Protein backbone atom coordinates (compact mmCIF):
# COMPACT_ATOMS: atom_id res chain seq x y z
CA UNK A 1 0.00 0.00 0.00
CA UNK A 2 1.51 3.31 -1.06
CA UNK A 3 1.80 6.35 1.20
CA UNK A 4 -0.98 8.29 -0.51
CA UNK A 5 -3.50 5.48 -0.04
CA UNK A 6 -2.29 4.88 3.51
CA UNK A 7 -2.98 8.49 4.44
CA UNK A 8 -6.41 8.37 2.79
CA UNK A 9 -7.42 5.27 4.73
CA UNK A 10 -6.05 6.78 7.94
CA UNK A 11 -8.17 9.91 7.45
CA UNK A 12 -11.33 7.82 7.34
CA UNK A 13 -10.40 5.57 10.27
CA UNK A 14 -10.42 8.43 12.76
CA UNK A 15 -12.48 8.70 15.97
CA UNK A 16 -16.06 9.76 15.29
CA UNK A 17 -16.09 8.51 11.70
CA UNK A 18 -18.82 6.10 10.62
CA UNK A 19 -17.53 2.92 9.00
CA UNK A 20 -19.57 0.06 7.53
CA UNK A 21 -18.03 -3.42 7.22
CA UNK A 22 -19.41 -5.70 4.50
CA UNK A 23 -18.97 -9.30 5.63
CA UNK A 24 -18.50 -8.29 9.26
CA UNK A 25 -18.99 -11.85 10.54
CA UNK A 26 -15.80 -13.06 8.86
CA UNK A 27 -12.82 -14.37 10.77
CA UNK A 28 -10.76 -11.20 10.28
CA UNK A 29 -13.63 -8.73 9.95
CA UNK A 30 -15.13 -9.40 13.37
CA UNK A 31 -11.96 -8.37 15.27
CA UNK A 32 -11.51 -5.47 12.85
CA UNK A 33 -14.94 -4.16 13.80
CA UNK A 34 -14.17 -4.49 17.50
CA UNK A 35 -10.79 -2.76 17.16
CA UNK A 36 -12.32 0.11 15.17
CA UNK A 37 -15.05 0.52 17.79
CA UNK A 38 -12.35 0.63 20.47
CA UNK A 39 -10.61 3.37 18.48
CA UNK A 40 -13.72 5.53 18.77
CA UNK A 41 -15.34 4.92 15.39
CA UNK A 42 -19.06 4.32 14.90
CA UNK A 43 -19.20 0.82 13.40
CA UNK A 44 -21.97 -0.93 11.53
CA UNK A 45 -21.78 -4.04 9.40
CA UNK A 46 -23.62 -6.63 7.40
CA UNK A 47 -23.36 -10.34 6.76
CA UNK A 48 -25.32 -12.86 4.77
CA UNK A 49 -26.18 -14.99 7.80
CA UNK A 50 -26.67 -14.61 11.52
CA UNK A 51 -23.97 -16.41 13.53
CA UNK A 52 -22.12 -16.53 16.83
CA UNK A 53 -19.81 -13.89 15.35
CA UNK A 54 -22.60 -11.46 14.51
CA UNK A 55 -24.25 -12.08 17.88
CA UNK A 56 -21.00 -11.18 19.63
CA UNK A 57 -20.73 -7.96 17.66
CA UNK A 58 -24.31 -7.02 18.52
CA UNK A 59 -23.58 -7.72 22.19
CA UNK A 60 -20.64 -5.30 21.92
CA UNK A 61 -22.92 -2.53 20.67
CA UNK A 62 -22.27 -2.84 16.93
CA UNK A 63 -25.30 -2.67 14.66
CA UNK A 64 -25.32 -5.67 12.30
CA UNK A 65 -27.64 -6.09 9.32
CA UNK A 66 -28.40 -9.61 8.13
CA UNK A 67 -28.39 -9.60 4.35
CA UNK A 68 -26.77 -7.14 1.96
CA UNK A 69 -28.96 -4.18 1.00
CA UNK A 70 -27.99 -0.81 -0.47
CA UNK A 71 -29.70 1.07 2.37
CA UNK A 72 -27.42 -0.56 4.95
CA UNK A 73 -24.62 1.89 4.14
CA UNK A 74 -26.65 5.03 4.79
CA UNK A 75 -24.66 7.50 6.89
CA UNK A 76 -21.34 5.73 6.41
CA UNK A 77 -18.21 7.80 5.79
CA UNK A 78 -16.45 4.78 4.31
CA UNK A 79 -17.02 1.10 3.61
CA UNK A 80 -14.61 -1.78 4.26
CA UNK A 81 -15.01 -5.14 2.54
CA UNK A 82 -13.39 -8.54 2.62
CA UNK A 83 -11.55 -9.81 -0.45
CA UNK A 84 -14.47 -12.19 -1.02
CA UNK A 85 -16.96 -9.32 -1.51
CA UNK A 86 -17.04 -8.17 -5.13
CA UNK A 87 -18.11 -4.99 -6.89
CA UNK A 88 -21.54 -6.40 -7.75
CA UNK A 89 -22.45 -6.58 -4.06
CA UNK A 90 -25.39 -4.15 -3.59
CA UNK A 91 -23.70 -2.33 -0.71
CA UNK A 92 -20.43 -1.90 -2.60
CA UNK A 93 -22.30 -0.74 -5.70
CA UNK A 94 -24.33 1.75 -3.64
CA UNK A 95 -21.22 3.10 -1.93
CA UNK A 96 -19.44 3.66 -5.24
CA UNK A 97 -22.51 5.32 -6.73
CA UNK A 98 -22.71 7.66 -3.74
CA UNK A 99 -18.99 8.48 -3.83
CA UNK A 100 -18.32 6.77 -0.50
CA UNK A 101 -14.75 5.37 -0.35
CA UNK A 102 -14.47 1.58 -0.35
CA UNK A 103 -11.38 0.10 1.29
CA UNK A 104 -10.14 -3.45 1.52
CA UNK A 105 -9.96 -5.27 4.85
CA UNK A 106 -6.19 -5.61 4.55
CA UNK A 107 -5.78 -1.88 3.95
CA UNK A 108 -7.62 -1.13 7.18
CA UNK A 109 -5.50 -3.61 9.15
CA UNK A 110 -2.38 -2.08 7.61
CA UNK A 111 -3.27 1.38 8.90
CA UNK A 112 -4.25 0.05 12.34
CA UNK A 113 -0.95 -1.83 12.55
CA UNK A 114 0.98 1.43 12.36
CA UNK A 115 -0.49 2.48 15.71
CA UNK A 116 1.29 -0.38 17.51
CA UNK A 117 4.93 -0.31 18.57
CA UNK A 118 5.31 -4.03 17.89
CA UNK A 119 3.54 -5.41 14.82
CA UNK A 120 4.03 -9.08 13.95
CA UNK A 121 2.79 -10.67 10.71
CA UNK A 122 2.89 -14.40 10.04
CA UNK A 123 2.51 -15.58 6.45
CA UNK A 124 3.15 -18.68 4.36
CA UNK A 125 1.46 -21.45 2.44
CA UNK A 126 1.14 -23.72 5.49
CA UNK A 127 1.51 -23.25 9.24
CA UNK A 128 0.20 -19.70 9.58
CA UNK A 129 -2.53 -20.47 12.10
CA UNK A 130 -0.31 -22.77 14.18
CA UNK A 131 2.57 -20.29 14.27
CA UNK A 132 0.30 -17.33 15.06
CA UNK A 133 -1.25 -19.35 17.89
CA UNK A 134 2.18 -20.19 19.30
CA UNK A 135 3.26 -16.54 19.21
CA UNK A 136 0.00 -15.57 20.92
CA UNK A 137 0.61 -18.08 23.72
CA UNK A 138 4.10 -16.66 24.28
CA UNK A 139 2.89 -13.06 24.37
CA UNK A 140 0.01 -13.89 26.70
CA UNK A 141 2.34 -15.75 29.05
CA UNK A 142 4.65 -12.72 28.98
CA UNK A 143 1.63 -10.55 29.91
CA UNK A 144 1.99 -8.32 26.84
CA UNK A 145 -1.80 -8.03 26.42
CA UNK A 146 -1.64 -8.29 22.60
CA UNK A 147 -4.27 -7.67 19.98
CA UNK A 148 -4.51 -10.84 17.88
CA UNK A 149 -6.17 -11.97 14.65
CA UNK A 150 -5.91 -15.69 13.85
CA UNK A 151 -7.52 -17.55 10.96
CA UNK A 152 -8.76 -20.29 13.27
CA UNK A 153 -9.96 -21.06 16.80
CA UNK A 154 -7.48 -20.79 19.68
CA UNK A 155 -8.72 -22.48 22.90
CA UNK A 156 -6.63 -20.08 25.00
CA UNK A 157 -8.72 -17.18 23.69
CA UNK A 158 -11.98 -19.14 23.25
CA UNK A 159 -11.99 -17.40 19.86
CA UNK A 160 -9.79 -16.61 16.89
CA UNK A 161 -9.11 -13.06 17.91
CA UNK A 162 -8.38 -10.84 20.86
CA UNK A 163 -8.53 -7.06 21.35
CA UNK A 164 -5.83 -6.15 23.85
CA UNK A 165 -4.54 -2.94 25.41
CA UNK A 166 -0.83 -3.60 24.93
CA UNK A 167 1.54 -2.19 22.32
CA UNK A 168 1.73 -5.46 20.33
CA UNK A 169 -0.44 -6.72 17.48
CA UNK A 170 -0.15 -10.16 15.87
CA UNK A 171 -1.84 -10.95 12.57
CA UNK A 172 -2.09 -14.11 10.56
CA UNK A 173 -1.36 -12.51 7.19
CA UNK A 174 -3.16 -14.08 4.26
CA UNK A 175 -1.64 -14.02 0.78
CA UNK A 176 -5.06 -14.11 -0.92
CA UNK A 177 -5.29 -11.18 -3.37
CA UNK A 178 -1.84 -10.11 -2.11
CA UNK A 179 -3.48 -8.94 1.13
CA UNK A 180 -0.28 -9.14 3.17
CA UNK A 181 1.39 -6.51 0.96
CA UNK A 182 -0.82 -3.90 2.66
CA UNK A 183 0.70 -4.51 6.10
CA UNK A 184 3.47 -2.65 7.93
CA UNK A 185 5.02 -5.20 10.30
CA UNK A 186 8.04 -4.68 12.47
CA UNK A 187 8.56 -8.43 12.28
CA UNK A 188 7.46 -10.62 9.36
CA UNK A 189 7.61 -14.42 9.57
CA UNK A 190 7.17 -16.69 6.55
CA UNK A 191 6.49 -20.35 7.22
CA UNK A 192 6.50 -22.91 4.39
CA UNK A 193 6.45 -21.18 1.01
CA UNK A 194 5.13 -22.61 -2.24
CA UNK A 195 5.26 -21.25 -5.76
CA UNK A 196 2.22 -18.95 -5.52
CA UNK A 197 3.70 -16.91 -2.67
CA UNK A 198 7.15 -16.79 -4.24
CA UNK A 199 5.58 -15.26 -7.35
CA UNK A 200 3.84 -12.63 -5.22
CA UNK A 201 7.03 -11.76 -3.35
CA UNK A 202 9.12 -11.50 -6.50
CA UNK A 203 6.66 -9.21 -8.26
Identify the residue ranges that each predicted region occupies.
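Preference for short coil/turn "hinge" residues that link or interrupt alpha-helices
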Residues: 6, 17-25, 50, 66, ...
Amino acid sequence: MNERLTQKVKKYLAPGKRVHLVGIGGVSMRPLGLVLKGMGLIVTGSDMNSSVSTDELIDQGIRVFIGHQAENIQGADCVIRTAAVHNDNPEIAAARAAGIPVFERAQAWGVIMQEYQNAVCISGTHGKTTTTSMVTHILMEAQKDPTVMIGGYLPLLHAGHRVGNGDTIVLESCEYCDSFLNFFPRWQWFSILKKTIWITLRT
